[in-house]
Amino acid sequence: MNAKSLKIILLILSVVAIKPIIADESSIYCFVGDAGEVNPTQAKVVKALANSDCSMVWHLGDITQLGVKSIDDPELQDSFLTPFKPFLETGIPLYLTVGNHDYKGDPSVYLKVAKDYPSIFHPSNFYTKTFGELCFFALDTTIFDKLYYFYKRGNQ
């Protein structure tokens, strides 16, 4: 993430964080990211999530290392759906945010995945989810990086 993207996120968070957050004390919010490489560590993380007390899990991006081109792409099964199956079977909500690696394919595939799996939530690349007075943002900053470099190249 570049400095400009970080400043935008911090600005948004500073506006949102003015009011103290009162969250449900019984809720446990869990976060994972860059989970697209199939290896023993990924399996341990998925198992831990499946056996956890998480109220929800938010995937912060890079769902697969190579991106996926379609709903039928073997990479989707091999790198995400099959390894995450033990967790998906728990019914704990999984909120997806796409990352730069997901743009190596077609990131809109995850919109279709969310329709096929009731526990996966991904209505768009930018969305919010509120739990009481606590609000989480899904901010796909990859598009801003691409626009930044596009315009930077055009001005040289």
Region spans (language model):
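Intrinsically disordered, low-complexity segments enriched in Ser/Pro/Gly/Ala and basic residues
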Residues: 4, 13, 25-26
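Bacterial N-terminal signal peptides that target proteins for export
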Residues: 1-8
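Extended active-site neighborhood of metal-dependent phosphoesterases/phosphodiesterases
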Residues: 69-156
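Bacterial N-terminal signal peptides
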Residues: 9-17
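N-terminal active-site segment of His-dependent metallophosphoesterases
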Residues: 17-75
